Amino acid sequence: TDISNVDDNNILLNVDEGALNNLSFGYGLSYDTRKTGLNASGGVLLRFDQDFSGLAGDIDATRTAVLALAEKTILNDSISLRIIGEGGIYDRTNGNSRLTERFFARGKLRGFESNGIGPRDKNVLKDALGGNYFASVRMETDFPVGLPEEYGITGGAFYDMGSVWGLDKTIGAGSDNIVDDSFNLRSAAGVSLFWSTPIGPLRFNWSRAFEKQSYDRVQNFD
C-alpha cells in the first residue's frame, strides 16, 4: 500500500505517508437461508470474514468483519422488514494502523456522507482518518404507497445507528491536534422511495441525523 501527496498540514496522515509491502490471506464463512430456507416469507444471512497479514511484507495484522441480516415479509408479502448488523476489528501488532488499513462507514450509515463519521483530523482539510473498529445496525421496512403496481413505485422507512472509532495514534509529534477517536454513537432516520425502471431499480433516501458529533458530515439526500 502507498500513501502519497499528503498535505503538509495533516500531521497524522504525514505519519502514514510512504509505501509498504503486504502479503495476506483470508477466508470467509457464510450461512444464507433467504432463498433456500423452508420459510418463504423470511430468512437470515450470517457472514464471517477474516484476513491475516504477516507471512511476508511489512504489515503484521488481523482484520475481522462480521455481518448478520434477518428479513421477513408480512401481510401477504406486501410489507418487508429487515435488520442488518455489521462490525469489524483491525488489529495490527507491528506498529500503528494506516489510513488504507482502517474501516470507514461507507454505505453503512445513512444520513451521513460516505466518510462522514469517525475520527477526523482537526487541520484545515478536516480529513477522515477511519478507525480500527466499526459497528452499525440498520433497520428498514418497504411497503406499498397506494399507487398501481405497474408504476413500480413503493415506499420505505429506516433507522440506522453505528460508529467508527479507535486509532493507534491520535496526535502528531509536537502537535496539539488531538483527535477524538472514542466511541460516539451516531443515528439517523428517514424515508425511502423505490422505483423499478427499465434501466434498473432506483432508490432515493431522505434522512435526518439525530445523534452526531460537531465534526461529522451529514447527508440528507442520496
Could you tell me what each predicted segment is?
Residues 26, 191-200, 219-222:
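Outer-membrane beta-barrel "beta-signal"
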Residues 2-153, 157-177, 211, 215-218:
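C-terminal outer-membrane beta-barrel translocator/porin domains of Gram-negative envelope proteins
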Residues 173-177, 182-197:
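Strand-loop-strand
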